[in-house]
Amino acid sequence: AFDMLGCWYGHGETADITTIRTAVLKEFEGKADVDYVAGCPFEGTDESGFRAAIKAAKKADVIVACLGEKGKWSGENASRASIELPEVQQKFLEELKKTGKPVVLVLSNGRPLQLDRMEPLADAIIEMWQPGIVGGTPLAGILSGRVNPSGKLAMTFPVTGGQIPIYYNRRQSARHHQGFYHDMTSDPLYEFGHGLSYTSFEYGEPVLSAKKVGQKGRFSVDVTVKNTGAVDGKEAVLGFVSCPYAVLTRPVKELRFFTKKEIKAGETVTCHFDLNVQRDLGFVNDRGETVVEPGEYHIIIGGKTVTLEVTE
């Protein structure tokens, strides 16, 4: 239970933690039978718990595999040479997959992980991080379907550690259209802002109030978002800005504005953003001054791009 607190947990006490086991038993009480088996340790080579866990898993309709990092493995002055989970956890997940039952992988960790070996073994992944004393309760709600998840990743998950640094707002490279690696993709496993829901959303094309605007001007952008699924849900609408040409090399893209909307099944909403050129398109130059250079800027929402021209 202590490991759910993570680093810098302040006044959090182990005795106050609602564990995953406690929360799941309460959530499914009278609705489903829940068996709990401690299958493997965080690290080491002890596989003695595998047999009992596999036996229970074969009788289950769904397997929930809770894996991850110890609470002290991340935080201040706590680095790891490899961001894969230890081999004993990998082997345990492989054995669970062999049962043929659906596997929900629940991760509790304090950093992005390398999941290239684990992801193919999971039918679903819930990233709960190290959520503190009440973290078990919302997790149980997501597992039961009482809660429709709407979170988005605030960090990028690489395919392998060799891709690091791979943060979303990294600088443009000289040959960014050709990629970086000869032996693998340049794309991450899960990018910044990724996150699934029990419903689905469809974005319309962003619409600008003007195609051109002055360096000290204002403009707005509207985008429609439709809930195309069968259940109500919330969607975080993220607005990115990209400046392909500037005196200083600019990031590939930067998150500059966002909102979150609750959208009923079948409903379409319009998200409106009032933007300020200096505030939302500007950057700090090598003299510490906030500047906006004239030229082309891309506004990206829901993976769709519209181009704005900033004039002198």
What residue ranges belong to the model's regions?
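Secreted, periplasmic, or luminal enzymes acting at the cell surface/secretory milieu
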Residues: 1-8, 12-21, 25-28, 108-234, ...
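Terminal connector regions
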Residues: 277-312
